[in-house]
Amino acid sequence: EHFKKLIKYDIIDQKAWFEHARDTFMDWDKRQGHYDDYLDEICDLYVKSLIGLDKTCIDFTSDQVIKLKSDRVYKYTRSRIKWHLDNNHIVIFISGSPGFLVEKMAKKYNVTDCIGSNYLFENVMFNGTVIPMWDSRSKNTAIDSFVEKYDIDLNKSYAYGDTNGDINMLRRVGNPIAI
C-alpha cells in the first residue's frame, strides 16, 4: 500500500511497479498468491525506489496509508488485539514491514510496543540500507529483547503469524496461532 501511495503522489515512477510487481501484488491482494512471493519480488524494488527520498515524503505517504488503509486488517486480528488489550496483556507487533509503518499501526491500535524492518536515513534521506525484521533470526532476536524488557513468560504468551518468517516465533510460545 505504501508503494502504491508513492506512485499515486508521483514520488516514484509507476513504470517499475507495472513492469515488476503488479501481478504478484494482485495475486497476494486477492489472497490467491503467497505473501512471501510478493515480499521477495517487491522488496528490492521498494527499497531501490525509496533511495534518496526525503523522510518527509515517506512520512507523508505513510500517514496517508494509515489514514486510508489501516482498517484493512482482518476482523479476527482486530478482535484478538482488542481481547488482549481488554485483558491487560502486553501486546507487541513484530513485523517485517517497514518500521515507520509498523509504529503508526501500533499507535493506532494502542499496543505496548513494536518493531519492524529498520530503514536507515542519512541527513533525512533514505540511504538504501534496511535492517530486516522479516526472517526468523531477526524475529527471534526481537522476541528475546522484548522478553527481557517486559519480563514475558513465553509459555503463557500468544503469537500470531502469517509468513514463513513467523514459524520459529510460533514454536516459541505456549499459544501459537497461524493466520
Predicted regions and their residues:
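Acidic/polar active-site rim loop that often engages polyanionic ligands
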Residues: 2, 40-43, 124-128
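Active-site phosphate-binding/coordination module
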Residues: 3-6, 10, 117, 133
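A metal-dependent, Asp-based hydrolase signature
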Residues: 7-83
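C-terminal cap/substrate-recognition subdomain and adjoining C-terminal extension
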Residues: 60-61, 67-179
